[in-house]
Design a protein with these regions (language model features):
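Alpha/beta enzyme core
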Residues: 3-242, 248-251, 255-256
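A short, charged, Gly/Pro-tolerant segment at domain boundaries
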Residues: 270-287
Length: 287
């Protein structure tokens, strides 16, 4: 399979069904988010059943900040390259859909599907006017409905993971956030979302309430110090993402190694790198 070979519709539909089934397994679907073809291939080789992108990592890798500073065209091009590099399903972080109108979201979804992805993360944040702010439930539900219609027209059972930033953006008073999240989740699922992503919360009490109150698979985002995959599994979490954490770790290593060689003239930071033959071998079959 060449990195220039497009994914056929039949293959894409099969991967979409596989990806959907991964949300109903005995263990949560764990997604160590990637940001370019190389990281995606490494994640696949490590044993990931699917590859998810991180918008922050993608943006940084292309020289842009997070928050829809990247154009739709650049984002879709990157997704196509990731899809062509791996053999597992790919789900794309499309932020808020790259545009203010529901028609913009539909256009982005069509582009992502043309690139071969089988899932999207679509958030209710708005990055316009210096944001981010959180859109109204009604407005974002309409955007999700537009995404669903676009996917249905293509004929791919796209997995729409509706992200709500109520906790991440500290919307309202703390005591109101659970109900606000549950109300948004219900509206988003009714509009066509297949799963709900609630970043910014990992405590067991809230996570358990979210699992019980949302009629769709729950996705949480983890960071150092968060509960383990097994602990989340015991509470019914269906999907676990790491967001930009791996990209951040890689860039931290880059800075540490650069500072070491530039200041002390030593190279100990390089010691745990993957070997040239191993890395090169990951991509030889794509030639």
């Amino acid at each position: 399979m060449s990195n220039e070979t497009p994914t056929t519709l039949a293959t894409q539909i099969e991967r979409a069904r596989t990806f959907r089934d991964l949300h109903a397994g005995e263990r949560p679907l764990v997604l160590p988010n990637a940001w370019d073809p190389a990281s995606a291939r490494v994640v696949e080789e490590a044993g990931a059943a699917a590859v998810a992108t991180t918008s922050a990592g993608v943006g940084w890798g292309l020289g842009f900040g997070d928050g829809e500073r990247l154009s739709r065209e650049r984002a879709v091009e990157l997704i196509a390259r990731v899809v062509a590099t791996v053999d597992v399903p790919v789900t794309a972080d499309i932020e808020a859909g790259y545009g203010e109108g529901a028609e913009d979201v539909a256009a982005t979804v069509r582009g992502v599907l043309a690139a071969g992805a089988v899932g999207v993360n679509l958030e209710d944040a708005s990055h316009a006017a210096g944001g981010p702010t959180v859109r109204s439930t009604e407005e974002n539900a309409a955007r999700i409905a537009a995404a669903r219609q676009a996917a249905d027209e293509v004929g791919v059972p796209l997995f729409i993971n509706a992200r709500t930033d109520v906790y991440l953006a500290s919307v309202g008073e703390p005591e109101t956030r659970l109900n606000e999240t549950l109300e948004r989740a219900a509206a988003y699922v009714a509009a066509g979302a297949d799963g709900v992503f609630v970043p910014g919360v990992v405590d067991f009490e809230t996570v358990t309430a979210l699992v019980k109150g949302i009629e769709a698979p729950l996705n949480v985002m983890v960071w150092p110090g968060a509960p383990s995959v097994e602990e989340f599994a015991e509470r019914g979490v269906a999907r676990i993402s790491v967001g930009a954490a791996i990209a951040q770790s890689v860039h931290a290593l880059t800075r540490r190694a650069a500072r070491e060689v530039l200041t002390s003239g030593t190279y100990t930071s390089f010691a745990e790198g993957l070997s040239y033959p191993e890395l090169n071998g990951l991509f030889e079959r794509r030639a």
